[in-house]
Amino acid sequence: MMSLSVRPQRRLLSARVSRSQSFAGVLGSHERGPRSFTVFSPPGPPRKPLVLSRVSRMFSVAHPAPKVPQPERLDLVYTALKRGLTAYLEVHQQEQEKLQRQIKESKRNSRLGFLYDLDKQVKSIERFLRRLEFHASKIDELYEAYCVQRRLRDGAYNMVRAYSTGSPGSREARDSLAEATRGHREYTESMCLLENELEAQLGEFHLRMKGLAGFARLCVGDQYEICMKYGRQRWKLRGRIESSGKQVWDSEETVFLPLLTEFLSIKVTELKGLANHVVVGSVSCETKDLFAALPQVVAVDINDLGTIKLSLEVIWSPFDKDDQPSAASTVNKASTVTKRFSTYSQSPPDTPSLREQAFYNMLRRQEELENGTAWSLSSESSDDSSSPQLSGTARHSTPKPLVQQPEPLPVQVAFRRPESLTSGSMDEEPAMTPSLVNGHAPYSRTLSHISEASVDAALTEAVEAVDSQSPIPGPSPLVYPDSTHVERVSSVLPVLNNGHSATSPALSTTGPAPTFIDPAPTTQLDLVHKTTDSAPSELPSITHTTTSSAYSAVSLVNSVPSLTSTTIGSAHTTTPSPLTSTGSVPNATDSTQATPSPTHSTPSPTHTTIRLTHTTVSPTHSSPSPIHTTPSPTHTTVSPTCTTPSSGHSTTSPTQEAKMSTHTTGAVGPVQTTTSPISTTESPSPSTDVAIISSSSAESTGPGTEPLPCSHPASPPYTKADPTASCTSYQSLASSGSKPLTSPAPDSPEQIPKSPSSSPSSSAPEPQHSEHNLAAVAQAPVPEATGGAGDRRLEEALGTLMSALDDYRGQFPELQGLEQEVTRLESLLMQRQGLTRSRASSLSITVEHALESFSFLNDDEDEDNDGPGDRHTSSPEVVAEDRLDSSNGQSLSTGCSALDATLVQHLYHCSRLLLKLGTFGPLRCQEAWALERLLREARVFQEVCERSKLWGNSATSAQEVVQFSASRPGFLTFWDQCTEGLSPFICSVERVLLTFCSQYGARLSLRQPGLAEAVCVKFLEDALGQKLPRRPQPGPGEQFTIFQFWSYVEALDSPSMDAYVTETAEEVLLVQNLNSDDQAVVLKALRLAPEGRLRKDGLRALSSLLVHGNNKVMAAVSTQLRSLSLGPVFRERALLCFLDQLEDGDVQTRVAGCLALGCIKAPEGIEPLVYLCQTDTEAVREAARQSLQQCGEEGQSAHRQLEESLDALPCIFGPSSMASTAF
């Protein structure tokens, strides 16, 4: 049984850090005197505004470049950074729209000085938005370059493994190995440099100390020392509690530079004397969630109980201190603008100031140059136009009597419009028809030109003279350039969306031209050559920022050309082409990626090209029968339309080599003909040869999607013969009478594995290859050996598990035994094949297959040269050659196909269980359950290794394979009946069900019809650790191994098979009665339910009655749970079950678990309940709060602390956004 004391050691990425957003400890007036912690500010006069010169930057040495790249961590930080930049853009766009609305609303009764200030802020925000978009595009380019280097490094790693297999070989082989090793090292260094470059673009974290908060913990006169460590950056501060309840700290503010791989360590020490210092607590906090546009008030639990909290205000700036834009604080100027607005709107216009007089003179000169007429300064003529200038219609109409004011004194302006540009604009004006707003043409100059004699203003002025089109009101970053603007627009800033980004084809720079990643494959290939040939010289140039004169003239709103339209350097310009796909097989998030179209200005979902891999293997269209199989040498399937492959087709085995044909949406599907029992499908559709390599980063799930929880494996996409007939017989399943699998919805990203040829996307981070294999295993079905000489599924499954265990080494001590047994199994298999130990774990990777890791370079070039329909079909000779190569190489095998299939199933099961490890937060029952199952699998591999000398012998009974530690009559006999006439190693679930019903159906049907089937299903689900489908699924069914049967029976308390069947039948009947719609049946079952019969399913049924039952039933369930929880055995069993329910995917199940924990008054559930109160949905939060109040004094204290902390925080930091705003 699993014990609650088992707390596995955590790795650093998932260190136990409470993500509590609470600011608990804000004491009320009734707690320990009149102390008030509502404001944490030192006594005396209020603080001055933030001055950057006063802020201490706690870093003297730059963070060193990493030695080993960490792509997984970079993916997480990049995703959080993009989310923060997008939020920054949205906030400033909203502020800009607000100011523009304010300008329109305040034109009639306001003086021009107020409009001047508003328009100045609008222009400042526009410049900041352009700079922010350029910064985001630079980050996208760095990340795309990093993805290319990562794929090249994975390919070089495959080459090294390929050359390292077997003996050293010839001198040429050794030289090739040295070259591949050198390339791997160079790619690694390039990745490290790119990580360092990207780290330099993360901006700054401005931290402000808010104070300590504690529930009955802080006293007057207490002194504390807080030490924060962030990489090489330090911040140490001391503070004391004053008698007034305020806290005084010697340092209040600091600036931290964000780091990619480091965590913020906080240590709080209470100073009590000269040497008596007490460490209150020390925690490590995640910082990737601090990339947010708005200031965040975060609270960190310093100790385990959460009685001491550190409150910090964190402000993230996307730019460094030395590179701060002038408009970074424009969002905070709304109060000043509102004050001016209220002042100016109460009185008539006053005498113009000198600045306004200069503005009037400039407008008068402009008017005289254009038509020689004068314009009035009267408020009656301003109306609601955007400038005092009258439209052409108004000028030619009958003049009205206007009140003329005396001409102000001439005042020299800081700069004037050049004569040439002015004349040019006058020449172009008659050819254009400006849009009219309330009968007036908007004036081309802005009010901000009066006081801003900068290069930025001059460039904008020149741009407006060249192209005097009417600006689009309001910022609109989601605009693509049309075909007429491609040639004359120097740069198009990227489109920022949630998870989608498009880099600019060319960017104007004044320095060396940086290398950019372009969506077109040719530019990607160009980047690869540049980064590999001159990495030290080219990589730093990627981060060169342009001066304000270069990028400030780029107008995303107006799409106007700038003065720097000619790119200095070797930057290339690519015309966007419609319907351009960036890869043969898109990632999970690539299916919604839109490409620029020359005829549209906005991205449209209908212009998205989704290329799906339609892999069809004929043996999957079969209904396997363990008794009768019919060989089918040929099988033809005609697909009328190109549909998304189902899970049984799309997930390719790590060792299956299938030729995949790509189709565009709506294309007619090909005719697929299989001419061999070995499932290799030939397709006349245009395709490229893609080989799936298990150790490369080819197969992956989308980063935005979680891997499948592995409730049950999907159908295998390859031939699944029944190896239990004989250890040396190889038969193919009959395909006659099968039905084609229906394709699921196209929005199922988990079912589309990523091809090695897909280009890296800036919006889709790629996990590392070890996580790729695990995620692919979670989706892939458990394969079963066909017994061929070229069958490499065993070694591929072994290599996948070994790679996964490498990632978890040292993090979970429980996995040490499993790793030893898997390594022992690999050694025994190698010895059987006569291989040396120096050979790598994945022996199937040859040099030819390793070279295909670089196939994405050629594929991208082919995509750029040929259209979607110009691909050449792969020849049948190539297909046959690949199949021949795969069958000629040596493969690991025990000599018995059934045992091979059994080992493959257990290896993949271990890989799926590893996905459940490393969870964050206090909900760890699934993790503990997975560790327990992994310990069982270690015993299985130990048993297999101990009987390695008997691998070649054909076992005929279960007695020859396994032995129980205690006498358990009936179990092995039952297994022999299930595998009668077959191998005893593996059996189908359907056969076990038929055997069980035939043996126990007559006896159990006397009590209730269908009870035997329900008992057997429960037995199989408990043994397999997953739910079985209630309806028959197409394709081969689930398999059940003798070792799964043996390890499950070993953990049972039942002495015999008959006793187990009787106990399980009683439990099944109890669960059915508890789930009955008849209230009398439910109450009777509750009254007669014995303590020993209430196990997991019964406890779940009881907890569900707390949600779905009426008041009488709920009261009876509560009473029953309280009385039964007095027993220690039942209480531990119930506690584990209800805690496990808190991690269920169903909301009602989590609500039931919360209410049940409150009924048994479990203090062990306080921490998980508090976590749910902060992170889950409203229904679960309400149930968790109700349960906390029932968990005694400690639970009520936690509930009060939670409520106070939530009330003290702003509404934007409520429970619904906890995960994104807390540490």
Swiss-Prot record:
Record note on quaternary structure: Interacts (via N-terminus) with RHOA (GTP-bound form); this interaction links active RHOA to STK24 and STK26 kinases. Interacts with RHOB. Interacts with RHOC. Interacts (via C-terminus) with PDCD10; this interaction occurs in a Rho-independent manner. Interacts (via C-terminus) with STK24; this interaction occurs in a PDCD10-dependent and Rho-independent manner. Interacts (via C-terminus) with STK26; this interaction occurs in a PDCD10-dependent and Rho-independent manner. Interacts (via N-terminus) with 14-3-3 proteins; these interactions occur in a Rho-dependent manner.
Assigned protein family: Belongs to the RIPOR family.
Highest taxon of source: Eukaryota
Compartments, record wording: Cytoplasm; Golgi apparatus
Post-translational modification Phosphoserine, affected residues: S22, S345, S347, S451, S454, S468, S748, S874, S875
Phosphothreonine: modified positions: T351
GO cellular component: cytoplasm; cytosol; Golgi apparatus; membrane
Protein name: Rho family-interacting cell polarization regulator 1
Main location: cytoplasm
Gene (name only): Ripor1
